[in-house]
Amino acid sequence: MGNIIQAQKGESFFDPACGSGEFISEIIKNQVAISGSEYDVDRLKISKMKMLVNDLSPSNISPSYFTEGHNLKKNFDIILSNPPFSLKIPFDMEMHFCMYGKPPTSNADFAFLQYCIFMLKDNGRAA
C-alpha cells in the first residue's frame, strides 16, 4: 500500500486507525511527517515502539477514537489506513466531518470514509 500512495519527502501522513503501526512502518522510509491515532492502548504502544525504533518521536501518535483530536479540516497530504470495520458509533460522537450524510450508528464504516476525506488536503491522496 505504501508504494501505491507514492509518498514524497516533506508530505504529511495520517493513519486514523493506526493499529500496531504497519502502515507507519512502511511509510517512514519516505521521510514524511507522520501522525496517527488508535483507540486500542496495546496496539498504540506497538505503534509508538516502531516509531522509536526508527529514531522518530512517537508524540504524533495519539490514543483516541478516529474522530477525536483532529478537528482541523484538510490537514494531510496522505491518508493510508485499514478501516476499523464494523465499529459502532458512540452515541455522543461529533459528526462535523460528515459531508455526505449522517452514517448509521450501528456501523462506523461510512463515518470513517467521510472522516478520511474530510482530513485530506484538496490534492491529497488516500488508500
Region spans (language model):
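Short acidic/glycine-rich loop or secondary-structure boundary segments that cap or lie
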Residues: 88-89, 124
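Short, flexible active-site loops
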Residues: 97-100, 125-127
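Conserved Class I SAM-dependent methyltransferase catalytic core
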Residues: 105-127
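Conserved S-adenosyl-L-methionine
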Residues: 1-81, 86-88, 94-99, 106, ...
